[in-house]
Design a protein with these regions (language model features):
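Active-site beta3 strand of CheY-like receiver
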Residues: 45-51
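Receiver (REC) domain active-site loop signature in two-component systems and cognate sites
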Residues: 56
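Two-component/phosphorelay signaling modules centered on CheY-like receiver
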Residues: 11-30
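CheY-like receiver
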Residues: 112, 119-144
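Acidic catalytic/metal-coordinating carboxylates
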Residues: 34, 60-64
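C-terminal output helix
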Residues: 87, 105-118, 122
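Alpha4 helix (beta4-alpha4-beta5 surface) of REC/receiver domains from two-component response regulators
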Residues: 63, 84-101, 112
Length: 144
């Protein structure tokens, strides 16, 4: 069973994302309320997927994603955030984030995204978007 780590400062969001990951076939092996322990958790668990919020206490998720991918380029990261500024999205794309899922998201769509991101590593491409979609009804901005 593929494994996942959830990093989000909201306990409610961690619970919701955890349930969606389980529906997508993942086992949640660790959770954190900020990105400060991300490197340590990744090294300990080597998950198949990481979900990461951007706006959290301490380091922001975009910076943490860039740091993790610089050290572990094989890490698969999905950003789950309500922040849809083009500069943060571009930082995440340059860092190699696989997908940028905007909150609030449709649960069925999120499950689909988690499954597709895992399959993406098996050469099934995600769709490409030219513009950042509004955060409603299950929008995601995959890596180009």
């Amino acid at each position: 069973m593929p494994s996942a780590i959830i990093v989000d400062d909201s306990p409610i969001m961690r619970t919701q994302i955890g349930k969606l990951l389980e529906l997508a076939g993942f086992s949640v092996v660790a959770q954190a309320g900020n990105a400060d322990r991300l490197m340590e958790l990744y090294e300990e668990h080597r998950p198949d997927l990481i979900t990461l919020d951007i706006v959290m206490p301490g380091r922001d998720g975009a910076t943490a994603a860039a740091e993790l991918r610089a050290r572990y380029p094989q890490a698969i990261i999905v950003i789950c955030t309500s922040l849809n500024t083009k500069d943060k999205i571009e930082i995440c794309r340059r860092a190699g984030v696989k997908c940028y899922l905007l909150k609030p998201f449709n649960p069925d769509y999120a499950v689909s995204v988690f499954r597709r991101v895992l399959n993406y590593t098996r050469e099934i491409p995600l769709p490409k978007f030219d513009d950042v979609p509004a955060p409603a009804g299950g929008n995601a901005v995959p890596r180009r």
